[in-house]
């Protein structure tokens, strides 16, 4: 399941200046991820990754944080993490309307396909 988007700000100074940090703040949903880019992320990154894991008999259940750079409407993979990103989770979770414990339970029990994940129509 696609679990929402966020965009963080890495630079220490305003206007994207200064050295990189672990994240100076974030907002969600990420404006840059439109329907076309989301489709590209899923088809070019998510599906091939999950297919490769399954092919190696190593199916994955849990968060797969995908750190991206988007340039000219194309997503480029920077990193994977098997946890939510910080500060991204701080702006994604307040938007979650569904019960997160139920989502985790269904993920552990390989039942996410039937799990409906609903979002509040807010920006954080």
For every predicted segment, state its role:
Residues 83-99:
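ATP-dependent carboxylate-activation loops
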Residues 38, 49, 95, 107, ...:
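Functionally constrained cores in energy, signaling, and assembly domains
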């Amino acid at each position: 399941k696609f679990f929402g988007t966020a965009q963080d700000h890495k630079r220490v100074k305003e206007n994207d200046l200064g050295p990189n940090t672990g994240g100076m703040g974030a907002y969600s949903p990420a404006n840059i991820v439109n329907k076309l880019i989301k489709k590209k992320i899923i088809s070019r990154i998510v599906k091939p990754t999950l297919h490769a894991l399954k092919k190696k008999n190593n199916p994955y259940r849990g968060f797969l944080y995908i750190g991206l750079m988007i340039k000219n409407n194309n997503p480029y993979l920077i990193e994977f993490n098997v946890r939510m990103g910080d500060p991204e989770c701080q702006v994604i979770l307040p938007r979650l309307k569904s019960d997160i414990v139920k989502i985790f339970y269904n993920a552990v029990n390989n039942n996410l396909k039937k799990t409906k994940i609903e979002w509040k129509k807010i920006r954080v």
